[in-house]
Amino acid sequence: PRTLSRGDQQRVAIASGLAMHTEYLVLDEPTSGQDGREKKKLMSLMEQLKAKGITILLVTHDMDVVAKNCTRVIVVANKEIVFDGVPSDLFLEENRPGIWGLTYPPAVLLGRCLPGAPYCKDMDTFCAKFLEIRKERVR
């Protein structure tokens, strides 16, 4: 494993967990060392696993993963739980992530610029909301 890249090490670790046919998968910073394409594939895999009923407990600083893949978020700051809820509640409250040193995912920021400030977990959601609003305005 020492000769593998960080991304390859992550993929081997995930494959090892899946080989055990477990109901739970624990991932520590799974997108670290992944390029954009590999990160997208990993996020898609996590969605597929979730659809199969596998519970994923993940530790991450990657807010794109949180916005797109998580159904529950626990934020720990200074050894205390400061937030426990759903991603939309975390990201839609003004400045909440920033006070803990977290960054907003680009899709969330763009969504906040649209009328009604809808929650956009990813760019596909943002584009769909944008086109929906545009279509309504053209009528």
Per-region residue spans from a language model:
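Hydrophobic anchor residue at the start of the ABC signature
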Residues: I14
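Conserved ABC ATPase signature
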Residues: P1-L4
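ABC ATPase nucleotide-binding domains
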Residues: P97-R139
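H-loop/switch region of ABC-family ATPase nucleotide-binding domains
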Residues: T60-H61
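Catalytic Walker B motif of ABC-type/P-loop ATPase nucleotide-binding domains
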Residues: L25-D28
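Conserved beta-strand-loop-alpha-helix hinge in the C-terminal portion
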Residues: E80-A107
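A short, surface-exposed alpha-helical micro-motif characterized by mixed small hydrophobic
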Residues: V66-K68
